[in-house]
Regions:
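Canonical radical SAM enzyme core domain
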Residues: 1-58, 65-74, 95-107
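Radical SAM enzyme [4Fe-4S]-AdoMet core and its adjacent flexible, acidic
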Residues: 57-184, 188-192, 208
Length: 298
């Protein structure tokens, strides 16, 4: 988790920044301990996304250690530790799903209810590993395990029909936002000082817009990459999207995927999971709203 570096950065940044600081963190959860919690509270972290890759056997296969340690149980215990010592931090358990482990999500939901019963500020949500249409992956064995647009929507709806809640089922979406990639004030850095506009491509230097020098100044600006990421993914410049009835409630889809499609020959499906299934989502929304109203009247 680079806890000492997080604290060092906060100390230096807060010394020159007088306005409030709001921080979030994405982590495997393995390295959370009392010292990590202390630093997380100090730097003002308000939410933590902790990733699971399935039930115990599956997760320990993906996130395995040579020692054979039960990584899954350690992560679950660390979630409890974080919630005990910093109950104000909102924890979201993100479950990476493919066709190989999708059947484990309901099991994880049951474990979540059993293990975290009575606790506040802990949630769970599926995260779909999508077929991004990579041209070099047409014959990959892994391709058949990935979700496409239709399969993702059907899985979300199936969960709802079976009584499992998820952020995807909320209709309409509770907020509208724009991706940070097109915000000229948003930036991320890798350990070597390379700068990126998108979290998803951190570490892939082809997407770096520049690099910090020894004085902390951003240099070697790649104007082509920067302009593509700031302006090359405008949904309203896409003729098909500009005529689509789902715009703007779809938020335009993922900009980096649009950039891959436009400039790199990608075949990403950037459409909302509502598309083609709006009536199904609306029926669930109306049924749940009526149930809530009926419960309130009792």
């Amino acid at each position: 988790m680079a806890v000492p570096q997080i604290e060092e950065f906060y100390d230096k940044f807060s010394a020159v920044w007088e306005k409030p600081i709001n921080s979030n963190i994405i982590t495997t959860g393995y390295h959370i301990n009392e010292e990590a919690v202390r630093v997380m509270k100090k730097v003002g972290i308000t939410s933590a996304q902790i990733t699971l890759d399935g039930m115990k056997e599956t997760h320990n296969t993906v996130k395995h250690l040579p020692s054979g340690e039960d990584v899954f149980e350690r992560v679950i215990s660390n979630i409890e530790l974080l919630n005990d010592q910093a109950p104000e931090i909102n924890i979201v358990i993100r479950v990476n799903l493919t066709h190989e482990n999708k059947h484990e999500y309901p099991q994880l939901c049951s474990l979540y209810v059993e293990r975290f019963k009575g606790r506040k500020n802990i949630g769970i949500a599926p995260a779909f590993v999508l077929d991004r249409g990579a041209s070099n992956c047409d014959k990959c064995e892994i391709k058949s395990t990935l979700f496409n647009h239709k399969e993702r929507s059907e899985f979300i709806l199936d969960l709802a029909y079976r009584g499992f809640n998820s952020p995807f089922i909320r209709y309409p979406e509770p907020f509208f936002n724009e991706c940070a990639i097109r915000n000229d004030m948003a930036i991320a850095f890798d350990p070597e000082g390379y700068a990126y506009k998108c979290w998803e491509v951190i570490g892939n230097k082809e997407y770096a817009i520049g690099k910090l020098n020894d004085d902390g100044i951003l240099t070697d600006i790649n104007q082509t990459v920067l302009n593509r990421q700031l302006y090359g993914a405008d949904t309203f410049d896409d003729p098909a999207c500009s005529k689509c009835k789902y715009l703007p409630i779809c938020n335009g889809g993922c900009p980096i995927q649009r950039i891959e499609n436009k400039f790199e020959g990608g075949h990403n499906d950037c459409c909302t999971y509502y598309k083609g299934f709006t009536s199904d989502f609306l029926k669930i929304h109306i049924a749940r709203k009526k149930a809530q109203e009926a419960a309130t009247e009792k």
